[in-house]
Amino acid sequence: MCGLALVIAGPALSLMTGQGASAADDVVTLAPVDVVEVSGLIDSIVADSIEKAIVRSQNNGAQAVIFQLNTKGAVVGRDRMTEVLTAISESKIPVAIWVGPSGSRAYGLPAQMLAVADVTAMAPGARIGRTGAMLSVNGSQVTFGAADEKLQAGSLGFLEAREQEALKFSTDDRGVPVLRNMLYALDGLTVRSVALDTVSDALDATGQVTREATTVRFFKLGFMPRLLHTVASPPSALLLVTIGLALLLFEFFTAGIGIAAFVGAVCLILGSMGIGALSMNGVGIAFLLAAFV
């Protein structure tokens, strides 16, 4: 009797095992999706990294690139942000933007990236808006449609953005809470004449249908670019310059072995690099110089 059971169960187990292996093989054959983290104020370093990420994904076999966005604004000018939006608009592969995870923000000029991306989604608890005057890309003003007016001066949560049709992906009330859901959202879409295949369906050992997402490759700023990005925010840059000058003056008026001077010089260099990465404004420079008089 036991032998008969083994004879019957053996092929069934082999079939389910084969289905599991087939599902794994299917996932392996799917082209990967690149995910690029974009966080903090958009400075020249981050703007360059966005453009380079698009070029990299076009050349490394990715079927799409997702920008995970969490930013409260930009310190680059409108012209530089226009170049970033143009790079997204002219990408040869689909570009998706996910404002997430929950609590993330897409404010200021960077929020307008959602208007030119192919697929856009938000996590519940995320907000977008405060875009200011809309930029123009290739002679046409970017737009969120009926949501333009509300987004320029205010902000919208997920449900409001979906209601105003500011997002380019229709989903249920849960939004897109995690990155895996963003991969599910891309599956089956045809963008820029590219049919996205990011999920493979198969039966597991219990006979239940499982969904396996394609391989995800994560990218973010390297050590030096990340350091420069950190010091390129106005508060950090000015604080480093102030500390650097204070330590240099302290070393000048006291007898020491040079530790304060060394630390001050490092802070001053980093602060100067941060200020150099910021967009210049004549009035701001005048106030900065006046502060040290």
Language-model regions: role of each:
Residues 176-293:
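Non-cytosolic juxtamembrane linkers/loops
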Residues 6, 31, 35-38, 121, ...:
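Preference for short coil/turn "hinge" residues that link or interrupt alpha-helices
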Residues 2-15:
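Bacterial N-terminal signal peptides
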Residues 15-231:
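Soluble extramembrane regions of membrane proteins in the secretory/endomembrane system
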